Structure formats: structure tokens, C-alpha cells
Swiss-Prot record:
Entry function: Catalyzes the conversion of glucosamine-6-phosphate to glucosamine-1-phosphate.
Catalytic activity: alpha-D-glucosamine 1-phosphate = D-glucosamine 6-phosphate
Keyword entries, A-Z: Isomerase, Magnesium, Metal-binding, Phosphoprotein
InterPro entries assigned: A-D-PHexomutase_a/b/a-I (IPR005844), A-D-PHexomutase_a/b/a-I/II/III (IPR016055), A-D-PHexomutase_a/b/a-II (IPR005845), A-D-PHexomutase_a/b/a-III (IPR005846), A-D-PHexomutase_C (IPR005843), A-D-PHexomutase_C_sf (IPR036900), A-D-PHexomutase_CS (IPR016066), Alpha-D-phosphohexomutase_SF (IPR005841)
Record protein name field: Phosphoglucosamine mutase
PTM statement from Swiss-Prot or TrEMBL: Activated by phosphorylation.
Organism the protein comes from: Streptococcus pyogenes serotype M12 (strain MGAS2096)
Cofactor note: Binds 1 Mg(2+) ion per subunit.
GN (gene name): glmM
GO annotation, biological process: carbohydrate metabolic process; peptidoglycan biosynthetic process; UDP-N-acetylglucosamine biosynthetic process
Protein family: Belongs to the phosphohexose mutase family.
GO cellular component, one term: cytosol
Length: 451
């Protein structure tokens, strides 16, 4: 991570940290870096979610892009994966999404996609950051016909919707409850599932600029759980603000998280011989029950650090076509280059339809172990060296011995704060509490900030 770019672009409180001035510079410098080797006039797609700050940042960003001679296609409100899809299929130089994903409305973010539809590589982000920090802006300033042009492109939404529908199957007879988080999916999910002939019920479909992710969406599925029960829906589907992740609800109202969704789709692909290298890419935070279910099914796994960018990196480097996170980021590389909540939802419904099984039946193959995570404030200089402290290493080894293979412990530093994260999984809540609390007490004693 750099000074400006985090794991998912540039983020901050809109008009305070992520200002129009910064958005203009990101457009100008980002557009230049991503198009400097183009032989024809570069084309860049720009989209946003429904936040009140979106149009302000969009205007500034587009002005920056136009100032370096780029032809900008303005998509309006569109899901993040829609930008990725259009960049690839319309052969654009780059794409930009203005969104802070599952964060509240006061935040916003700007993330770039290269001409291959993937998020930027670290070296490209560092090149943009170098221009941001340069004492003087020395980039070309074209005039007259050298300036960029702006094209309103509402057709982009229709093309993305049509693509989504082509990946699905006829859902006649199926009732689907949707929660579009008052976000980007609110302009597309209804139409897509109606085109697939599903009966639908929808909440979180009335964005006002301030209510994105507010008590709705993948991080707040409680209303969707109630809607599923009230309507007798076969499944519920909750997206986040930019629709790059999905959390599902089965017909009984129970949550089906990313681990279970990935397993269900992975097993289906594996049985059809369509799972590349018969392997699923997941992160260190995936539940132990997920790993045991994969082992039972004979599916291999590749494990990465937390973050969908690391999952995608492993998929690209090793040729895998399915990966994701417990949080609901699911990447199906046969169709798109980034997490896509609506695409994942369609594939999940397809598995249900083609197997004739309910979502609760499909999800029951993964027994989710109780999981507890505690964040402990420690000396920043020690967070990466905790395992070098004998008392900490010894207590972790002791707890793992007691688990005897029927549980899991993960101790890792925060990437951004002076915190050590202690996580455990075990068959019962009482066991999880015991393992985490025992380790946490030793960590606090040895390297905690309060000592």
C-alpha cells in the first residue's frame, strides 16, 4: 500500500479527505499514467454509486481526465464489476469507479481498472502517487482539439445487464428477495432477475444519496432475512454499495456467507469438470468448516492473505477460475475479472435451479465453526514480531495442541493500525472464547500498550 492508495483504491471522508481537488488530480495523473502509451485517443469509462458526494467527485475526476486529452464515457450509477466488464469488452484504456463499497455515505473512494479489467498493479499506483507528490505538475496541457471529450453512455448499464442475464438460467417458479443496499445494484438487480423470469421482492432500492448501506445490504442483512420469511422466498440476495460482494439468505432466513457460497458454486463446477485445476482460492480468514468441506469433496485450495486483490493475484498467476472471501467477494474468472455480487447471485440461483436443491440443503454441506476475533492494541514496533516473544509463541502452541486438529488459531498484525488480531475457531462458542481469551491475555501482558 502507498501513501494514497490502499488495498481498494483511494478512500476517505468525502470533501474532507477525498476532496474535489484530489479527485481532479487523480483523474489527470491517473489518466495520463494509464494512457501514456496509447497510439489513438484514449477512452476511459467512469461510473459511481449512489452517494451524495458521487456527482461532485465525478465532475472533478472527469475534468482531470479531459485535461490530458482523454475521451471520457460517463456511465452514471453502475456496479463496480460493470466498469471492469465494459473496459474489457469495449477495449477502453482504463476504467474508474467512484465508491466506498460497504462504507457509510459520508465516505467515498476512487479506484482504477487497467485496460485488462483488473485493478491496478502496485507499480502503476506508485507512478500515480509520484505525480501527486511532485513539486510541480509538468504533464502536457493540450488545448482546442487536443482536449478530451465527454460522452454520456447510458447504454453501458444495458450492456452489463444483458451480459449478466446470459450467464444465468431460466428461474421460472423461483421467488427471489433482493436487497440492493440503496446502492449501485438498485439500478440493475431488479431488471436482471425479472429477465431471468424470477418472481421478486425488493428492499434497499430507493437511494437518496445518504442511505447507502444504512441498515441494508450485505453488512446489514436483517431486513432481508425478515423479507424472505414474509414472502416465502426461495432465497435472499444482499449486495453492498457498489455490488462487488454478495451475502445470501436461505429459505428459512439463515445467513449463507461467502465461504458457503464459494463452496456451493465450486462443488457444482468441480462436478461438471469446470473448476480449473480443481482448486478454489481463499484467504486465511476462511472458516475451518469450509476447509473441511472442500477436503471431503476432494477440492484443492490455495490460501492467500486477506483481501480480494490477493485472491485475484493468485488466480491470475496460477490459472484458477474461482476464488473469494468470507465477506462475500466472489471472483468467477470465467466471466469477470473482479468480485461481482450480481453475477455470483445468478450463479448461486442457477445451481439451485439445476440441482433442484434448496439453498439450506446446499449450504448444509459446510458446517461453520464458531469464530471469534479480538483486536489487541500493541506497540506498533512489536505487531510484526509478536511470534518472536516466547510466551506468546508458547501459549499459541499449547492451545493448538489442545485443539488436536479440531480447531484453528490465527494471529496476525493489522496492516494499517497498531493492532494484533487474535482469531480462533472451534466446535463450540465456549471453546472459542477459551482459546481467544487465553491467548489475548498473554499478548496484553507481554506487548499490550496498556502495560
Amino acid at each position: 500500500m502507498g501513501k494514497y492508495f490502499g488495498t481498494d483504491g483511494v478512500r476517505g471522508e468525502a470533501n474532507v479527505e477525498l476532496t474535489p481537488e484530489l479527485a481532479f488530480k487523480l483523474g489527470r495523473f491517473g489518466g495520463y499514467v494509464l494512457s501514456q502509451h496509447e497510439t489513438e485517443r484514449p477512452k476511459v469509462f467512469v461510473a459511481r454509486d449512489t452517494r451524495i458526494s458521487g456527482e461532485m467527485l465525478e465532475s472533478a475526476l472527469i475534468a482531470g481526465l479531459l485535461s490530458v486529452g482523454i475521451e471520457v464515457y460517463k456511465l452514471g450509477v453502475l456496479a463496480t464489476p460493470g466498469v471492469s466488464y465494459l473496459v474489457r469488452t469495449e477495449k477502453a484504456s482504463a476504467g474508474v469507479m467512484i465508491s466506498a463499497s460497504h462504507n457509510p455515505a459520508l465516505d467515498n473512494g476512487i479506484k482504477f481498472f487497467g485496460n485488462d479489467g483488473f485493478k491496478l498493479a502496485d507499480d502503476q499506483e506508485l507512478e500515480i502517487e509520484a505525480l501527486l507528490d511532485a513539486p510541480e505538475d509538468t504533464l502536457p496541457r493540450p488545448s482546442a482539439e487536443g482536449l478530451g471529450t465527454l460522452v454520456d453512455y447510458p447504454e453501458g448499464l444495458r450492456k452489463y445487464e444483458k451480459f449478466l442475464v446470459t450467464t444465468g438460467t431460466d428461474l421460472s417458479g423461483m421467488t427471489v428477495a433482493l436487497d440492493t443496499a440503496n446502492g449501485a445494484a438498485s439500478v440493475s438487480a431488479r431488471d436482471v432477475f425479472l429477465d431471468l423470469n424470477a418472481e421478486i421482492a425488493v428492499i434497499g432500492e430507493k437511494p437518496n444519496g445518504l442511505n447507502i448501506n444504512d441498515g441494508v445490504g450485505s453488512t446489514h442483512p436483517e431486513q432481508l432475512q425478515e423479507l424472505v420469511k414474509e414472502t416465502g422466498a426461495d432465497l435472499g440476495l444482499a449486495f453492498d454499495g457498489d455490488s462487488d460482494r454478495l451475502i445470501a439468505v436461505d429459505e428459512t432466513g439463515e445467513i449463507v456467507d461467502g465461504d458457503r457460497i464459494i463452496f456451493i458454486i465450486g462443488k457444482y463446477l468441480s462436478e461438471k469438470g469446470l473448476l480449473a485445476h480443481n482448486t478454489i482460492v481463499t484467504t486465511v480468514m476462511s472458516n475451518l468448516g469450509f476447509h473441511k468441506a472442500l477436503d471431503k469433496q476432494g477440492i484443492n485450495k490455495a490460501i492467500t492473505a486477506v483481501g480480494d486483490r490477493y485472491v485475484v493475484e493468485e488466480m491470475r498467476s496460477s490459472g484458477y477460475n474461482l476464488g473469494g472471501e468470507q465477506s462475500g467477494h466472489v471472483i468467477i474468472m470465467d466471466y469477470n475479472t473482479t468480485g461481482d455480487g450480481q453475477l455470483t447471485a445468478i450463479q448461486l440461483a442457477k445451481v439451485m435451479k439445476e440441482t433442484g436443491k434448496s439453498l439450506s440443503e446446499l449450504a448444509a454441506e459446510v458446517t461453520i465453526y464458531p469464530q471469534k476475533l479480538v483486536n489487541i492494541r500493541v506497540e506498533n514496533s512489536m505487531k510484526d514480531r509478536a511470534m518472536e516473544v516466547p510466551a506468546i509463541a508458547n501459549i499459541i502452541a499449547k492451545m493448538e495442541d489442545e485443539m488436536a486438529g479440531n480447531g484453528r488459531i490465527l494471529v496476525r498484525p493489522s496492516g494499517t493500525e497498531p493492532l494484533l488480531r487474535v482469531m480462533a475457531e472451534a466446535p463450540t462458542d465456549a471453546e472459542v472464547d477459551y482459546y481467544v481469551d487465553t491467548i489475548a491475555d498473554v499478548v496484553r501482558t507481554e506487548i499490550g500498550c496498556d502495560n
